[in-house]
């Protein structure tokens, strides 16, 4: 998820903003969870924010495995009640400055103004909260399986909080490459054919089904990592997210193979829409917009 060509990303963003006729240029960005360090530390309750920051920076070597002058960090006092009323839990979040600056640079090249830097897992948590009550009664532990272009991320939610995140290098790019190789297409042509579902008759059996089986294996492996590193041995529900969540047959196959109910995430399920919004397009893309939705909701914090 590194930005290798900020100019190209900025150009694409500028064209997207112009096409969408966006009124505000203020933006919230998210850094991948794998690039971020989070720690919960206990501090005195009567400290103000300036005092907390000084204390955190003084103790930074305990928490951050790279030089402080290379770190972008923030903190927030959590509402947790501790046994000692004179102490509070503080969430510390840190990443390398370059991880924020690379994204900010691309946004600025696209004519946008970065205002907030968040973390992908926090954005997903934010988005999940607005539609979690649409899940069946008794669902408390939910796995959000986000299958992107090159990365698949499992985020496990417990009572509307992210308690586990695991990323692995696997995504829809593999399917596009298989289409490209089998049918002699360019990568761009293969991507368009995959999206429009205009492929030869043998596509489902020869290309799609092996890819779906690979997704199941990746999902099962991620769940096993979660179970082996926590006190949990099962989850209640799986939500499919990401640009590949709507691949025909994927949700059904995951449900059959993993033994959990699987549905496709839609963070906009309970939202109203402006008349000029193409609702059908939003519904088609909803599963891939979890992070974007969570970031947009920051404006209501």
Where are the language model's segments positioned?
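Terminal alpha-helical anchor/extension segments at protein ends
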Residues: 106, 174-176, 212, 251, ...
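N-terminal phosphate-binding loop and adjacent alpha-helix
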Residues: 1-18, 202-207, 279-283
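Glycine-rich phosphate-binding loops at beta-strand->alpha-helix junctions
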Residues: 211, 234-263, 267-269
